[in-house]
Structure formats: C-alpha cells, structure tokens
C-alpha cells in the first residue's frame, strides 16, 4: 500500500529502491574502511622496512625508536599508532614475514604474503604474529581471518 508524502506517493518500488541505495552506501563504507586499513598497513610495512634498514645501515641501534615516536607524535598529535611499542611491533611485523621469506624461496611469495597481511586489521596482525611460532601457522590464521571475518577474540 502506498503512503502519501507532500505530493509524493511512497510505493513499494520506492522503498525497495531506497533500501538498495542504503545497502550500496553501507557497502561503499565497508570498501572505504578496507582500503584505509590497507593503506595504513602499507605505511606500517614501509616503516618496518625503514626501521630495520636504518638500524642495520646507519647503526642507530634501538634507542632511535623513542625519538622517532616523540617526533611523529609531536607532528601528528591526534593520530594514534606512533607509540614506541607500536613502532617496535611494526618493526617486528615486517621482520617476522620478511625474514621467513628465505624459507619460501620466492620474492613473489613475499609479495603475496605482504598483500595477505595488509588485508586484515592491524590488531589482528599483532595478535597473530605474537602468538604464532611459524610463518605457516601465521598465514593459516591470516587466511582464516580473511575467509571468515574472524574477530581478534577467535
């Protein structure tokens, strides 16, 4: 049954159309969130690589992470993710998968791994990398998280 709104008759067709628009908006929001997450993790991957390289090549040791954290937090005060602990986690995350690439004997496999781990949220990545003993075990949980939309509590 149609209802009237100031010169407009609301039909079932209109309601279905609005429902479709709402669903498309929600899907766009989800896609945007996934893309934002991927870009953030892409940044984290690059930061991890840079931290590892600076520690090896510039011989800065571990203490520069505290200064790096202060500098980034000062420049981006409202942005989380640049604490000393998180920067250390970012470094560990990069090393965990990068160091294990020798066992996989393929650069293309590392790129596949990189794309996989960037497809799940940072909190999930942290939980997986700290709990798993091997890259195979970690990738199992990354894949299951992607396939089943697992939360961190699983």
Describe every region a protein language model picked out:
Residues 1-154:
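Basic, low-complexity intrinsically disordered segments
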């Amino acid at each position: 049954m149609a209802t009237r709104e100031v010169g407009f008759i609301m039909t079932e067709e209109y309601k279905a159309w609005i429902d479709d628009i709402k669903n498309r908006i929600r899907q766009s929001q989800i896609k945007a969130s996934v893309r934002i997450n991927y870009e953030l993790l892409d940044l984290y991957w690059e930061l991890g690589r840079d931290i590892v390289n600076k520690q090896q090549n510039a011989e800065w040791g571990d203490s520069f992470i505290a200064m790096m954290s202060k500098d980034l937090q000062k420049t981006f005060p409202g942005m989380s993710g640049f604490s000393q602990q998180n920067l250390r986690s970012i470094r560990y995350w990069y090393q965990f998968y990068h160091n294990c690439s020798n066992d996989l004997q393929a650069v293309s496999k590392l790129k596949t791994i990189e794309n996989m781990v960037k497809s799940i949220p940072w909190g999930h990545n942290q939980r997986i990398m700290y709990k798993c003993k091997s890259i195979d075990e970690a990738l199992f949980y990354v894949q299951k998280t992607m396939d089943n939309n697992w939360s961190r509590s699983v």
